Protein backbone atom coordinates (compact mmCIF):
# COMPACT_ATOMS: atom_id res chain seq x y z
CA UNK A 1 0.00 0.00 0.00
CA UNK A 2 1.50 3.33 -1.02
CA UNK A 3 1.90 6.11 1.50
CA UNK A 4 0.01 8.51 -0.74
CA UNK A 5 -3.18 6.53 -0.20
CA UNK A 6 -2.88 6.70 3.58
CA UNK A 7 -4.70 9.64 5.08
CA UNK A 8 -2.30 11.71 7.25
CA UNK A 9 0.26 8.86 6.83
CA UNK A 10 -1.14 7.34 10.00
CA UNK A 11 -1.25 3.71 8.88
CA UNK A 12 2.53 3.49 8.58
CA UNK A 13 3.19 4.42 12.20
CA UNK A 14 0.28 2.34 13.44
CA UNK A 15 1.61 -0.77 11.70
CA UNK A 16 5.10 -0.21 13.11
CA UNK A 17 3.79 0.29 16.64
CA UNK A 18 1.57 -2.79 16.43
CA UNK A 19 4.38 -4.96 15.08
CA UNK A 20 7.04 -3.91 17.60
CA UNK A 21 4.75 -3.82 20.64
CA UNK A 22 2.42 -6.80 20.19
CA UNK A 23 5.01 -8.94 18.42
CA UNK A 24 7.08 -9.27 21.62
CA UNK A 25 4.36 -11.22 23.40
CA UNK A 26 3.45 -14.75 22.41
CA UNK A 27 -0.16 -14.28 23.47
CA UNK A 28 -0.61 -11.29 21.17
CA UNK A 29 0.88 -12.82 18.04
CA UNK A 30 -2.52 -13.80 16.65
CA UNK A 31 -3.92 -10.39 17.48
CA UNK A 32 -0.89 -8.82 15.83
CA UNK A 33 -1.59 -10.66 12.57
CA UNK A 34 -5.21 -9.57 12.68
CA UNK A 35 -4.24 -5.96 13.27
CA UNK A 36 -1.67 -5.99 10.47
CA UNK A 37 -4.29 -7.47 8.13
CA UNK A 38 -6.76 -4.83 9.25
CA UNK A 39 -4.34 -1.95 8.65
CA UNK A 40 -3.07 -3.23 5.30
CA UNK A 41 -6.25 -4.54 3.70
CA UNK A 42 -8.91 -2.09 4.66
CA UNK A 43 -7.37 1.33 5.19
CA UNK A 44 -10.16 2.05 7.66
CA UNK A 45 -7.93 3.10 10.53
CA UNK A 46 -7.23 6.46 8.92
CA UNK A 47 -10.90 7.01 8.20
CA UNK A 48 -12.00 6.38 11.77
CA UNK A 49 -9.04 8.36 13.13
CA UNK A 50 -10.00 11.32 11.00
CA UNK A 51 -13.64 10.82 12.00
CA UNK A 52 -12.73 10.86 15.71
CA UNK A 53 -10.55 13.96 15.30
CA UNK A 54 -13.35 15.67 13.41
CA UNK A 55 -15.88 14.92 16.15
CA UNK A 56 -13.42 16.04 18.83
CA UNK A 57 -12.91 19.33 17.00
CA UNK A 58 -16.66 19.82 16.81
CA UNK A 59 -17.10 19.03 20.49
CA UNK A 60 -14.16 20.88 22.01
CA UNK A 61 -16.51 22.55 24.44
CA UNK A 62 -17.46 19.24 26.07
CA UNK A 63 -13.85 18.03 26.13
CA UNK A 64 -12.62 21.29 27.66
CA UNK A 65 -15.37 21.25 30.25
CA UNK A 66 -14.53 17.68 31.19
CA UNK A 67 -10.80 18.38 31.61
CA UNK A 68 -11.12 21.73 33.40
CA UNK A 69 -13.89 20.59 35.73
CA UNK A 70 -12.09 17.55 37.15
CA UNK A 71 -11.66 19.19 40.56
CA UNK A 72 -14.96 21.05 40.72
CA UNK A 73 -17.30 18.40 42.04
CA UNK A 74 -20.23 20.53 43.12
CA UNK A 75 -23.91 19.85 42.91
CA UNK A 76 -24.30 22.51 40.25
CA UNK A 77 -21.66 21.05 37.91
CA UNK A 78 -22.10 17.33 38.66
CA UNK A 79 -24.85 16.73 36.10
CA UNK A 80 -23.06 18.77 33.42
CA UNK A 81 -19.76 17.00 34.08
CA UNK A 82 -21.42 13.61 33.83
CA UNK A 83 -22.74 14.55 30.40
CA UNK A 84 -19.31 15.84 29.32
CA UNK A 85 -17.65 12.65 30.56
CA UNK A 86 -19.91 10.36 28.55
CA UNK A 87 -19.49 12.47 25.41
CA UNK A 88 -15.69 12.50 25.85
CA UNK A 89 -15.66 8.75 26.51
CA UNK A 90 -17.73 7.92 23.41
CA UNK A 91 -15.58 10.11 21.16
CA UNK A 92 -12.19 9.03 22.54
CA UNK A 93 -12.78 5.29 22.62
CA UNK A 94 -14.86 4.99 19.47
CA UNK A 95 -12.14 3.35 17.42
CA UNK A 96 -10.97 1.14 20.31
CA UNK A 97 -14.46 -0.33 20.64
CA UNK A 98 -14.72 -0.75 16.88
CA UNK A 99 -11.37 -2.56 16.75
CA UNK A 100 -12.40 -4.85 19.61
CA UNK A 101 -15.60 -5.87 17.81
CA UNK A 102 -13.65 -6.39 14.59
CA UNK A 103 -11.26 -8.81 16.32
CA UNK A 104 -14.16 -10.61 17.97
CA UNK A 105 -15.95 -10.84 14.63
CA UNK A 106 -12.87 -12.21 12.86
CA UNK A 107 -12.15 -14.87 15.50
CA UNK A 108 -15.72 -16.14 15.71
CA UNK A 109 -16.48 -16.10 12.00
CA UNK A 110 -13.23 -17.28 10.47
CA UNK A 111 -13.38 -20.97 11.38
CA UNK A 112 -17.13 -21.54 11.84
CA UNK A 113 -19.08 -23.14 8.99
CA UNK A 114 -22.35 -21.64 7.90
CA UNK A 115 -24.32 -24.64 9.16
CA UNK A 116 -22.93 -24.30 12.71
CA UNK A 117 -23.52 -20.58 12.60
CA UNK A 118 -27.19 -21.17 11.73
CA UNK A 119 -27.43 -23.78 14.49
CA UNK A 120 -26.06 -21.36 17.11
CA UNK A 121 -28.38 -18.56 16.00
CA UNK A 122 -31.35 -20.94 15.94
CA UNK A 123 -30.54 -22.28 19.42
CA UNK A 124 -30.31 -18.83 20.95
CA UNK A 125 -33.46 -17.75 19.13
CA UNK A 126 -35.38 -20.80 20.40
CA UNK A 127 -34.19 -20.20 23.97
CA UNK A 128 -35.20 -16.54 23.91
CA UNK A 129 -38.53 -17.39 22.25
CA UNK A 130 -39.41 -19.98 24.92
CA UNK A 131 -38.29 -17.68 27.72
CA UNK A 132 -40.17 -14.61 26.47
CA UNK A 133 -43.34 -16.44 25.43
CA UNK A 134 -43.45 -18.41 28.67
CA UNK A 135 -43.03 -15.23 30.67
CA UNK A 136 -45.80 -13.47 28.75
CA UNK A 137 -48.35 -16.27 28.75
CA UNK A 138 -47.72 -18.13 32.01
CA UNK A 139 -45.67 -15.94 34.32
CA UNK A 140 -47.38 -12.61 33.80
CA UNK A 141 -50.82 -11.97 35.30
CA UNK A 142 -53.18 -10.39 32.84
CA UNK A 143 -55.48 -7.63 34.07
CA UNK A 144 -59.13 -8.11 33.19
CA UNK A 145 -60.48 -5.25 35.30
CA UNK A 146 -63.42 -4.21 33.12
CA UNK A 147 -64.17 -7.69 31.77
CA UNK A 148 -66.59 -10.20 33.19
CA UNK A 149 -65.60 -13.53 34.70
CA UNK A 150 -66.93 -15.38 31.65
CA UNK A 151 -64.61 -13.44 29.36
CA UNK A 152 -61.73 -14.12 31.73
CA UNK A 153 -62.35 -17.86 31.54
CA UNK A 154 -62.75 -17.62 27.75
CA UNK A 155 -59.38 -15.93 27.23
CA UNK A 156 -57.55 -18.22 29.64
CA UNK A 157 -58.94 -21.31 27.90
CA UNK A 158 -58.16 -19.79 24.50
CA UNK A 159 -54.51 -19.26 25.48
CA UNK A 160 -54.29 -22.81 26.83
CA UNK A 161 -55.81 -24.36 23.69
CA UNK A 162 -53.59 -22.20 21.49
CA UNK A 163 -50.39 -23.40 23.16
CA UNK A 164 -51.56 -27.02 23.11
CA UNK A 165 -52.07 -26.79 19.34
CA UNK A 166 -48.75 -24.98 18.99
CA UNK A 167 -46.93 -27.66 20.93
CA UNK A 168 -48.54 -30.45 18.89
CA UNK A 169 -47.61 -28.85 15.56
CA UNK A 170 -43.98 -28.29 16.48
CA UNK A 171 -43.71 -31.74 18.08
CA UNK A 172 -44.89 -33.29 14.81
CA UNK A 173 -42.41 -31.16 12.89
CA UNK A 174 -39.54 -32.26 15.16
CA UNK A 175 -40.62 -35.91 14.79
CA UNK A 176 -40.56 -35.68 11.00
CA UNK A 177 -37.24 -33.85 11.08
CA UNK A 178 -35.45 -36.48 13.18
CA UNK A 179 -36.96 -39.41 11.28
CA UNK A 180 -36.27 -38.13 7.78
CA UNK A 181 -33.21 -38.33 5.56
CA UNK A 182 -30.21 -36.04 5.88
CA UNK A 183 -31.68 -33.38 3.60
CA UNK A 184 -35.01 -32.85 5.28
CA UNK A 185 -36.73 -30.17 3.28
CA UNK A 186 -34.58 -29.88 0.19
CA UNK A 187 -35.91 -31.62 -2.90
CA UNK A 188 -35.34 -31.44 -6.62
CA UNK A 189 -38.95 -30.33 -7.04
CA UNK A 190 -39.76 -32.17 -10.31
CA UNK A 191 -43.42 -31.11 -10.19
CA UNK A 192 -42.56 -27.43 -9.57
CA UNK A 193 -44.51 -27.59 -6.32
CA UNK A 194 -42.79 -24.67 -4.62
CA UNK A 195 -42.65 -22.50 -7.72
CA UNK A 196 -46.19 -23.01 -9.03
CA UNK A 197 -48.41 -24.11 -6.15
CA UNK A 198 -46.89 -22.82 -2.92
CA UNK A 199 -45.09 -19.53 -3.22
CA UNK A 200 -42.84 -17.47 -5.45
CA UNK A 201 -40.11 -15.18 -4.22
CA UNK A 202 -41.82 -12.14 -5.69
CA UNK A 203 -45.05 -12.97 -3.88
CA UNK A 204 -43.12 -13.88 -0.74
CA UNK A 205 -41.38 -10.49 -0.51
CA UNK A 206 -44.67 -8.69 -1.06
CA UNK A 207 -46.29 -10.64 1.78
CA UNK A 208 -43.33 -10.15 4.11
CA UNK A 209 -43.43 -6.40 3.46
CA UNK A 210 -47.12 -6.32 4.42
CA UNK A 211 -46.40 -8.46 7.48
CA UNK A 212 -43.60 -6.11 8.55
CA UNK A 213 -45.96 -3.14 8.34
CA UNK A 214 -48.51 -5.15 10.33
CA UNK A 215 -46.01 -5.78 13.14
CA UNK A 216 -45.17 -2.07 13.24
CA UNK A 217 -48.87 -1.19 13.36
CA UNK A 218 -49.46 -3.68 16.20
CA UNK A 219 -46.64 -2.08 18.17
CA UNK A 220 -48.13 1.39 17.60
CA UNK A 221 -51.77 0.73 18.50
CA UNK A 222 -50.97 -0.40 22.04
CA UNK A 223 -50.54 3.23 23.13
CA UNK A 224 -53.26 4.92 21.04
CA UNK A 225 -56.88 5.79 21.65
CA UNK A 226 -59.66 6.30 19.13
CA UNK A 227 -60.46 9.90 19.98
CA UNK A 228 -58.14 11.28 17.29
CA UNK A 229 -58.77 10.90 13.58
CA UNK A 230 -55.19 9.89 12.74
CA UNK A 231 -55.27 7.13 15.36
CA UNK A 232 -58.46 5.84 13.79
CA UNK A 233 -56.66 5.78 10.44
CA UNK A 234 -53.88 3.64 11.97
CA UNK A 235 -56.43 1.20 13.39
CA UNK A 236 -58.17 0.90 10.01
CA UNK A 237 -54.83 0.42 8.23
CA UNK A 238 -53.93 -2.35 10.67
CA UNK A 239 -57.28 -4.04 10.01
CA UNK A 240 -56.64 -3.79 6.25
CA UNK A 241 -53.23 -5.47 6.59
CA UNK A 242 -54.80 -8.21 8.74
CA UNK A 243 -57.41 -8.92 6.04
CA UNK A 244 -54.81 -8.93 3.23
CA UNK A 245 -52.50 -11.38 5.02
CA UNK A 246 -55.48 -13.54 6.02
CA UNK A 247 -56.56 -13.84 2.37
CA UNK A 248 -53.01 -14.67 1.25
CA UNK A 249 -52.49 -17.33 3.92
CA UNK A 250 -55.93 -18.82 3.23
CA UNK A 251 -55.17 -19.07 -0.48
CA UNK A 252 -51.83 -20.78 0.17
CA UNK A 253 -53.33 -23.19 2.70
CA UNK A 254 -56.18 -24.18 0.34
CA UNK A 255 -53.69 -24.62 -2.51
CA UNK A 256 -51.49 -26.91 -0.40
CA UNK A 257 -54.40 -29.08 0.72
CA UNK A 258 -56.05 -29.37 -2.71
CA UNK A 259 -52.87 -29.95 -4.70
CA UNK A 260 -51.18 -32.57 -2.54
CA UNK A 261 -54.16 -34.47 -1.11
CA UNK A 262 -52.65 -34.81 2.36
CA UNK A 263 -55.76 -36.12 4.06
CA UNK A 264 -55.95 -39.37 2.04
CA UNK A 265 -54.31 -42.00 4.22
CA UNK A 266 -52.53 -44.97 2.66
CA UNK A 267 -52.34 -48.06 4.88
CA UNK A 268 -49.89 -49.80 2.58
CA UNK A 269 -47.12 -47.24 2.89
CA UNK A 270 -48.04 -45.87 6.35
CA UNK A 271 -47.58 -42.40 4.99
CA UNK A 272 -49.47 -39.66 3.25
CA UNK A 273 -50.66 -40.68 -0.20
CA UNK A 274 -48.83 -38.33 -2.54
CA UNK A 275 -48.19 -38.22 -6.24
CA UNK A 276 -44.47 -38.75 -5.84
CA UNK A 277 -42.94 -42.05 -4.69
CA UNK A 278 -39.73 -40.58 -3.34
CA UNK A 279 -39.32 -40.40 0.40
CA UNK A 280 -37.55 -37.07 0.11
CA UNK A 281 -40.51 -35.51 -1.68
CA UNK A 282 -42.93 -37.00 0.86
CA UNK A 283 -40.92 -35.45 3.68
CA UNK A 284 -40.90 -32.10 1.93
CA UNK A 285 -44.65 -32.12 1.42
CA UNK A 286 -45.30 -33.17 5.02
CA UNK A 287 -43.05 -30.37 6.19
CA UNK A 288 -44.94 -27.87 4.03
CA UNK A 289 -48.26 -29.18 5.39
CA UNK A 290 -47.16 -28.60 9.00
CA UNK A 291 -45.90 -25.12 8.21
CA UNK A 292 -49.16 -24.34 6.39
CA UNK A 293 -51.26 -25.53 9.35
CA UNK A 294 -49.17 -23.53 11.81
CA UNK A 295 -49.37 -20.38 9.69
CA UNK A 296 -53.12 -20.73 9.23
CA UNK A 297 -53.70 -21.22 12.96
CA UNK A 298 -51.65 -18.14 13.75
CA UNK A 299 -53.43 -15.93 11.23
CA UNK A 300 -56.82 -17.15 12.49
CA UNK A 301 -55.78 -16.33 16.03
CA UNK A 302 -54.61 -12.87 14.91
CA UNK A 303 -57.88 -12.18 13.06
CA UNK A 304 -60.16 -13.12 15.96
CA UNK A 305 -58.06 -11.43 18.65
CA UNK A 306 -57.51 -8.26 16.63
CA UNK A 307 -61.13 -7.67 15.68
CA UNK A 308 -62.24 -8.44 19.23
CA UNK A 309 -59.68 -5.89 20.41
CA UNK A 310 -60.87 -3.40 17.78
CA UNK A 311 -64.49 -3.81 18.89
CA UNK A 312 -63.60 -3.26 22.54
CA UNK A 313 -61.55 -0.19 21.59
CA UNK A 314 -64.51 1.26 19.70
CA UNK A 315 -66.67 0.64 22.74
CA UNK A 316 -64.34 2.03 25.42
CA UNK A 317 -62.16 4.46 23.38
CA UNK A 318 -58.99 2.91 24.82
CA UNK A 319 -56.59 0.16 23.83
CA UNK A 320 -55.67 -3.03 25.62
CA UNK A 321 -51.90 -3.42 25.77
CA UNK A 322 -51.85 -7.16 26.49
CA UNK A 323 -54.21 -7.98 23.58
CA UNK A 324 -52.14 -5.86 21.18
CA UNK A 325 -49.02 -7.59 22.54
CA UNK A 326 -50.60 -10.97 21.83
CA UNK A 327 -51.24 -9.94 18.21
CA UNK A 328 -47.66 -8.68 17.92
CA UNK A 329 -46.21 -11.94 19.20
CA UNK A 330 -48.31 -14.05 16.86
CA UNK A 331 -47.39 -11.79 13.93
CA UNK A 332 -43.69 -12.31 14.73
CA UNK A 333 -44.23 -16.08 14.86
CA UNK A 334 -46.04 -15.88 11.51
CA UNK A 335 -43.09 -13.90 10.12
CA UNK A 336 -40.67 -16.66 11.16
CA UNK A 337 -42.93 -19.41 9.82
CA UNK A 338 -42.99 -17.74 6.42
CA UNK A 339 -39.20 -17.89 6.35
CA UNK A 340 -39.39 -21.58 7.34
CA UNK A 341 -41.76 -22.20 4.44
CA UNK A 342 -39.18 -21.09 1.86
CA UNK A 343 -36.39 -23.05 3.52
CA UNK A 344 -35.79 -25.01 0.27
CA UNK A 345 -34.90 -21.72 -1.42
CA UNK A 346 -32.57 -20.80 1.43
CA UNK A 347 -30.97 -24.26 1.37
CA UNK A 348 -30.40 -23.97 -2.37
CA UNK A 349 -29.08 -20.46 -1.87
CA UNK A 350 -26.37 -21.57 0.59
CA UNK A 351 -25.79 -25.03 -0.84
CA UNK A 352 -22.52 -24.08 -2.52
CA UNK A 353 -21.03 -22.46 0.60
CA UNK A 354 -22.93 -24.40 3.27
CA UNK A 355 -19.98 -26.28 4.82
CA UNK A 356 -17.25 -23.83 3.84
CA UNK A 357 -15.75 -21.28 6.22
CA UNK A 358 -15.02 -17.62 5.72
CA UNK A 359 -11.25 -18.00 6.10
CA UNK A 360 -10.67 -17.01 2.46
CA UNK A 361 -11.98 -13.55 3.29
CA UNK A 362 -9.45 -13.02 6.09
CA UNK A 363 -6.41 -14.45 4.31
CA UNK A 364 -6.86 -13.28 0.74
CA UNK A 365 -9.41 -10.56 0.28
CA UNK A 366 -8.58 -10.13 -3.40
CA UNK A 367 -9.35 -13.76 -4.17
CA UNK A 368 -11.76 -14.36 -7.01
CA UNK A 369 -14.01 -16.42 -4.73
CA UNK A 370 -15.36 -13.21 -3.20
CA UNK A 371 -16.33 -11.87 -6.60
CA UNK A 372 -17.73 -15.26 -7.64
CA UNK A 373 -19.85 -15.34 -4.50
CA UNK A 374 -21.19 -11.84 -5.21
CA UNK A 375 -21.87 -12.81 -8.83
CA UNK A 376 -23.68 -15.95 -7.63
CA UNK A 377 -25.91 -13.87 -5.32
CA UNK A 378 -26.73 -11.42 -8.10
CA UNK A 379 -27.59 -14.16 -10.61
CA UNK A 380 -29.74 -16.03 -8.09
CA UNK A 381 -31.88 -13.05 -7.10
CA UNK A 382 -32.14 -11.74 -10.67
CA UNK A 383 -33.33 -15.13 -11.91
CA UNK A 384 -35.81 -15.33 -9.03
CA UNK A 385 -37.41 -12.03 -9.99
CA UNK A 386 -37.24 -12.41 -13.77
CA UNK A 387 -38.51 -15.98 -14.10
Swiss-Prot record:
Subcellular location: Mitochondrion
Main location: mitochondrion
GO cellular component: mitochondrion
Keywords, alphabetical: Mitochondrion
Source taxon at top rank: Eukaryota
Keyword Mitochondrion: yes
Entry protein name: Uncharacterized mitochondrial protein ORF14
Organism: Paramecium tetraurelia
